[in-house]
Amino acid sequence: MSDTASFRDTLEVFENPAPTRNFTIEHHCPEFTSVCPKTGQPDYGTIVFTYVPDRVCVELKSLKMYLQKFRNEGIFYEQVTNRILDDFVAVVQPRKVTVESKWTPRGGLNSNIIVTYPDEA
């Protein structure tokens, strides 16, 4: 697995234009690709970010470049979804965020992984 810091360094932010207001931003990234660590076959999915920014918002080109770094990574659905959330929280520091990965069916099964910050436990 590649170095977490080098992935996080790809993400850029800009100042929240309305930091005193709670508002929701939703980004859909329908061309996500990673590699199944068991089979070596590509996995395709959509990553959806739904977040309430605090001081900053994520810059979209950097988000696209960040997600493209996973293209050749052998990583399970659950692991990549949690890693994306952890990296997003570390850089953007949102008030709250949900990351959902929606995977293209494989072998007659499809998977959706949903992770949130802060934890809703």
Swiss-Prot record:
It is found in: Cytoplasm. Its EC number is 1.7.1.13. One of its GO terms (biological process) is tRNA modification. The keyword Aminoacyl-tRNA synthetase does not apply. The keyword Cytoplasm applies. Catalyzes the NADPH-dependent reduction of 7-cyano-7-deazaguanine (preQ0) to 7-aminomethyl-7-deazaguanine (preQ1). This is NADPH-dependent 7-cyano-7-deazaguanine reductase.
